[in-house]
Amino acid sequence: MKLFDEYPYLTDGRILLRKIVPADAGALQALRTDKEVYRYLLTFLYEQKYPDVNEVIRRMDEECFQTKESLLLAVCLTEQPDELCGIAEIYAYEPWRRKASIGYRLRRAYWGRGIAMAVARLLREYLFRTVHLHTVTAHIMTDNRSSAAVLLKAGFPERYSNVLEDWGLEVPVLVDKYVLKEAEDLAEQTGIRIENEV
């Protein structure tokens, strides 16, 4: 399956990722207007593009999914599947390299509950097992230690530290890059290590 063939519905039994729908407008508005949520995030994230949250949802399919720019999914608890508690994102898809990046942001009421780690694991599983990518990356501001802990627990090793990137702010920001390769993911799942030939 290719990444943009269809919207996935992913669950681990506790968390689910699904398509964002018009009924999510209120929760999405609460998320996107919380400055603390966006403290360590890019200034040009899609949910911030239009003043009207309903327009964001209306245009999301056409401007993100159909153009294959990014895939944004609602993060929900399985016991509350209609309540958006955050956004999961797959972006920077490079099909010729079988590579993509992931991101996530949660409403503050859902912080500290292991949800971000579950999201990272669900995206990882989907991208390696279903989409058959070779590489999945995540970029976070160096100061964002909470997200660093999430990614490490989700199995993403830190590969590059203190890299300057343009995140739409007045000056470039220091970013840490977490990169997971398919062979490493397989080794973690099976306990079998694949060594490169010399």
Identify the role of each PLM range:
Residues 1-39, 72-198:
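Acyl-donor (CoA/ACP) binding surface of acyl/acetyltransferases
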Residues 38-59:
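Conserved GNAT-fold acetyl-CoA-binding loop/helix
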Residues 45-49, 71, 143:
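Short, conserved alpha-helical segments within structured domains
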Residues 58-74:
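A short helix-loop-beta-strand connector motif used in the catalytic cores of GNAT acetyltransferases and
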